[in-house]
Amino acid sequence: MRALHRRGARIAFYEKDLPYYAAHRDLAAPDYCDLRLYSSWDDIRTAALREAAASDIVVTASYCPDGALISDEILELDGPLHVFYDLDTPITLNLLQDKGTDYLRREQIARFDLYLSFTGGVVLHQLEREYGARLARPLYGCVDPDAYRRTAVREEFRNSLSYLGTYAPDRQQKLDELFLEPARRSADMQFVLAGPLYPNHWTWPANVRRFEHVAPAQHAALYSSSRATLNITRQEMADSGFCPSGRFFEAAACSAPILTDWWKGLDAFFDPRDELHLVRTADDVLSCLNAGDAELRAKAERARCRTLAEHTGERRADQFLGFCDEAYRRQYSPTEVTA
């Protein structure tokens, strides 16, 4: 959004004021958009629909509380381009085949002018061919290089390996193998795990430092204080492929060596041999952590250069506007599997 604002866009961002996010809000007063917090849709419905009707583009997103209900009303507006942005498309589609979601119904997909997906690859074909999406395009995560860059080490974050992520059951097996087991076998190393919702009854290795929440403004310091950082992909996302986490690019922009599991399409974003460290077992992780600093830093620097060239907010803003223009014209070529 910041990059779009720099291009002259005026952005109104509506967010439901939920208790957890209220306690950990990233920005109380962002300078690149008008933040509109609301307690219930009914409270702001009239004003929001009036503002949406006067807009060029209206975007609704996955996980928006009551999003399907809101989209029903947004989609009735004649003026704006209707866009849906899905941050977890494979998960959304699996839910639609099962119990459904409260942020999107299957029949709504065909009504959006543009369906943007945080995941690329074959899921784009699936959206168009099986769900009737008019135009499905990938809009991957990105990084703001002004906010994410190498900083001085902070002692409270200093570690040999960090992992930043919310608890998810389908990541647990990999978390145990690639993070907790290396910690158990390396009493002389310090590990940092940051993120909410981990079970209270868990017993952590003594050398794992826990942070329930690290504000985005401190992410760069955490990455810069990590000798290496770990990326773990949710299984449904990994099965689909082409699913880079935004934190992937944030860590790379901070020159943090990245250890990661493999998923289809990873090599479309980074060179797995020259820019990343692929890990499948605890032994792989320990081998990386026992490597020399020069080897770790060389790959990290190559990943940083790749990120700044291809994965910034500026690049994504250009892509977003290009996809919107494509949707306006309604003349597009078939989606490529490697998109």
Predicted regions and their residues:
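Structured loop/turn residues at beta-strand edges in well-structured enzyme cores
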Residues: A53, L77, A110, Y131-R134, ...
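Extended catalytic core of nucleotide-activated donor transferases of GT-like folds
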Residues: M1-R2, R6-R7, I11-L127, Y131, ...
